[in-house]
Amino acid sequence: MCIRDSIGLYRNEQTYEPVEYLCKLPKTKNKTVLVLDPMLATGNSSSAAIDLIKERGVKVKNIKLVSLLAAPEGIKNLRKNHKDLHIFTCSLDKGLNKKKYIVPGLGDAGDRYMGT
């Protein structure tokens, strides 16, 4: 059975750090948890989400991160903070620009999703 719950984070554009606005997670200690991050840039938001999941007793070996597009910086950050994390991405781009967006990238995933 699949249980879907949510962690809502957005990036503070001045500090580039994640800000949590929603956390609705069940206790799923022995389940596999998929973290979906469409564009893995700095890895800060994904790392914060994984920390919240780990606080609920889930072991890193049971967490899988899935992204469409990733930057090397984000993968490095996740590896540093969550050594045994499984990371799956469709494509690895060059890196990040000054605003910490993936280049060449696809733009802002949240803006695209929300149509803004």
Where are these regions (language model features)?
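PRPP-associated nucleotide enzymes
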Residues: R4-T116
